[in-house]
Protein backbone atom coordinates (compact mmCIF):
# COMPACT_ATOMS: atom_id res chain seq x y z
CA UNK A 1 0.00 0.00 0.00
CA UNK A 2 1.24 3.51 -0.80
CA UNK A 3 2.04 5.93 2.01
CA UNK A 4 -0.66 8.53 1.45
CA UNK A 5 -1.27 11.50 3.71
CA UNK A 6 -4.04 13.99 4.27
CA UNK A 7 -3.39 17.10 2.21
CA UNK A 8 -1.37 15.35 -0.49
CA UNK A 9 -2.19 16.11 -4.10
CA UNK A 10 -2.37 12.96 -6.18
CA UNK A 11 -3.29 12.33 -9.80
CA UNK A 12 -6.33 10.07 -9.96
CA UNK A 13 -8.16 8.37 -12.83
CA UNK A 14 -11.77 9.37 -12.10
CA UNK A 15 -13.29 7.47 -15.03
CA UNK A 16 -15.89 6.15 -15.44
CA UNK A 17 -18.26 8.89 -14.36
CA UNK A 18 -21.97 9.56 -14.65
CA UNK A 19 -23.84 12.78 -15.30
CA UNK A 20 -22.07 15.89 -14.02
CA UNK A 21 -19.38 14.09 -12.00
CA UNK A 22 -15.82 15.31 -12.49
CA UNK A 23 -13.87 12.88 -14.67
CA UNK A 24 -10.58 12.26 -16.50
CA UNK A 25 -7.17 11.81 -14.91
CA UNK A 26 -6.74 14.87 -12.71
CA UNK A 27 -5.13 16.06 -9.50
CA UNK A 28 -7.11 15.50 -6.30
CA UNK A 29 -6.55 16.40 -2.65
CA UNK A 30 -6.65 13.61 -0.06
CA UNK A 31 -9.00 14.73 2.74
CA UNK A 32 -9.46 11.56 4.81
CA UNK A 33 -7.52 11.27 8.06
CA UNK A 34 -4.19 9.46 8.10
CA UNK A 35 -5.51 6.51 10.15
CA UNK A 36 -7.85 5.60 7.29
CA UNK A 37 -5.24 6.46 4.67
CA UNK A 38 -2.85 3.92 6.20
CA UNK A 39 -5.35 1.12 6.76
CA UNK A 40 -7.94 1.03 3.98
CA UNK A 41 -7.74 1.34 0.20
CA UNK A 42 -10.76 3.65 -0.06
CA UNK A 43 -9.98 7.29 0.65
CA UNK A 44 -11.90 10.54 0.19
CA UNK A 45 -10.59 13.09 -2.32
CA UNK A 46 -11.46 16.55 -3.62
CA UNK A 47 -10.96 16.89 -7.39
CA UNK A 48 -8.96 19.83 -8.70
CA UNK A 49 -10.04 21.51 -11.91
CA UNK A 50 -8.88 24.33 -14.14
CA UNK A 51 -9.47 27.82 -12.73
CA UNK A 52 -12.04 30.07 -14.34
CA UNK A 53 -13.87 33.15 -13.13
CA UNK A 54 -17.29 31.47 -12.95
CA UNK A 55 -16.01 28.59 -10.80
CA UNK A 56 -14.02 30.99 -8.62
CA UNK A 57 -17.26 32.72 -7.52
CA UNK A 58 -18.62 29.52 -5.91
CA UNK A 59 -17.94 29.65 -2.17
CA UNK A 60 -17.08 25.94 -1.88
CA UNK A 61 -14.49 26.15 -4.66
CA UNK A 62 -11.02 26.95 -3.32
CA UNK A 63 -8.51 28.87 -5.45
CA UNK A 64 -5.09 27.18 -5.57
CA UNK A 65 -1.91 28.73 -6.94
CA UNK A 66 0.80 26.46 -8.40
CA UNK A 67 3.94 25.90 -6.34
CA UNK A 68 6.88 23.54 -6.08
CA UNK A 69 5.34 22.18 -2.86
CA UNK A 70 1.92 21.28 -4.28
CA UNK A 71 3.09 20.17 -7.73
CA UNK A 72 0.36 22.05 -9.58
CA UNK A 73 1.43 23.67 -12.86
CA UNK A 74 -1.35 26.25 -13.26
CA UNK A 75 -3.89 28.18 -11.22
CA UNK A 76 -6.61 25.73 -10.22
CA UNK A 77 -9.80 25.21 -8.22
CA UNK A 78 -10.42 22.57 -5.54
CA UNK A 79 -14.06 21.64 -6.22
CA UNK A 80 -15.19 20.63 -2.73
CA UNK A 81 -18.76 19.93 -3.89
CA UNK A 82 -17.36 17.03 -5.97
CA UNK A 83 -15.74 15.27 -2.97
CA UNK A 84 -15.78 11.52 -3.59
CA UNK A 85 -14.37 8.19 -2.41
CA UNK A 86 -11.79 6.38 -4.54
CA UNK A 87 -9.93 3.10 -4.24
CA UNK A 88 -6.38 4.40 -4.48
CA UNK A 89 -5.05 0.92 -5.30
CA UNK A 90 -7.09 1.06 -8.52
CA UNK A 91 -7.19 4.78 -9.37
CA UNK A 92 -3.92 6.38 -8.16
CA UNK A 93 -1.69 7.52 -11.03
CA UNK A 94 1.02 9.44 -9.14
CA UNK A 95 1.72 11.68 -6.16
CA UNK A 96 2.25 15.35 -7.11
CA UNK A 97 2.89 17.17 -3.86
CA UNK A 98 1.39 18.54 -0.66
CA UNK A 99 -1.01 21.41 0.05
CA UNK A 100 0.14 24.12 2.41
CA UNK A 101 -1.47 24.11 5.86
CA UNK A 102 -3.30 27.33 4.93
CA UNK A 103 -4.77 25.88 1.73
CA UNK A 104 -5.78 22.66 3.52
CA UNK A 105 -7.56 24.72 6.19
CA UNK A 106 -9.51 26.54 3.45
CA UNK A 107 -10.46 23.20 1.86
CA UNK A 108 -11.58 21.94 5.30
CA UNK A 109 -13.80 25.00 5.69
CA UNK A 110 -15.40 24.45 2.29
CA UNK A 111 -16.03 20.75 3.03
CA UNK A 112 -17.73 21.72 6.30
CA UNK A 113 -19.96 24.08 4.32
CA UNK A 114 -20.79 21.39 1.71
CA UNK A 115 -21.79 18.84 4.36
CA UNK A 116 -23.52 21.33 6.66
CA UNK A 117 -20.99 21.09 9.50
CA UNK A 118 -20.47 24.83 9.86
Predicted regions and their residues:
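Conserved functional hotspots at enzyme active or ligand-binding sites that engage polyanionic ligands
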Residues: 1-118
Amino acid sequence: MNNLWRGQIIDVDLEPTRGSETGKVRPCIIVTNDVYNARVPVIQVVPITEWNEKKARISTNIDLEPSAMNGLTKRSIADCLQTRPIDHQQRLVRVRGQLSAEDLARVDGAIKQVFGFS
